[in-house]
Swiss-Prot record:
This is Large ribosomal subunit protein uL10. Part of the ribosomal stalk of the 50S ribosomal subunit. The N-terminus interacts with L11 and the large rRNA to form the base of the stalk. The C-terminus forms an elongated spine to which L12 dimers bind in a sequential fashion forming a multimeric L10(L12)X complex. GO terms for cellular component: large ribosomal subunit. Forms part of the ribosomal stalk, playing a central role in the interaction of the ribosome with GTP-bound translation factors. Pfam families: Ribosomal_L10. It comes from Bacillus cereus (strain G9842). It comes from the Bacteria. The gene is rplJ. The lineage of its organism: Bacteria, Bacillati, Bacillota, Bacilli, Bacillales. NCBIfam families: PRK00099.1-1. PANTHER family: 39S RIBOSOMAL PROTEIN L10, MITOCHONDRIAL (PTHR11560). Keywords: Ribonucleoprotein, Ribosomal protein, RNA-binding, rRNA-binding.
Length: 166
């Protein structure tokens, strides 16, 4: 086998592994972004723990088929970049959506969230969700509210009894 074919097979395997392992994968069209804008986008994604790479569409199609995500192939036309996140489901959608609001050249095409194909509208809906940490803090505050109210009521009763006893 030639060296070129081996290299391409390694890239296909790498992409397929990333597709399988990532919780969130977003495909974007980056045509029209300047080098400085693309660099800024990469920086923001890196800070959010998201990997952002450009692959040949033909190799990405083969990888999507081998990762059993062939429905992603219809969105692989033109210059594409793919954002992979193994940790946070919301992070790539949030960063890309915020960046796309300020830079019309960036177009979100589709994504795969936990193995399910999602459209542009679904990616935008996910982008409006708070991060995992934000959701956990909201849940914690909801769980603490009844306990806090009970403690305040108990304290008020104790203070009232002290006033009556004094």
């Amino acid at each position: 086998m030639s060296k070129v074919i081996e290299t391409k097979q390694q890239v296909v395997t790498e992409i397929a592994d990333k597709l399988r392992a990532s919780k969130s994968t977003i495909v974007v069209d980056y045509r029209g972004l300047t080098v400085s804008e693309a660099t800024e986008l990469r920086k923001q994604l890196r800070e959010a723990g998201v990997e952002f790479k450009v692959y040949k569409n033909s190799l990405t199609r083969r990888a999507a088929e081998s990762a059993e995500m062939a429905e992603l192939n219809e969105f692989l036309t033109g210059p594409n970049a793919i954002a992979f996140s193994n940790e946070d489901v919301v992070a790539p959608a949030k960063v890309l959506n915020d960046f796309a609001k300020n830079h019309e050249a960036l177009e979100i095409k589709a994504g795969v969230i936990e193995g399910k194909l999602v459209t542009l509208d679904e990616v935008k809906a996910i982008a409006t969700l708070p991060s995992r940490e934000g959701l956990l803090s909201m849940l914690l505050s909801v769980l603490q509210a009844p306990i806090r109210n009970l403690a305040l009521a108990t304290k008020a009763v104790a203070e009232q009894k002290e006033e009556q006893g004094a």
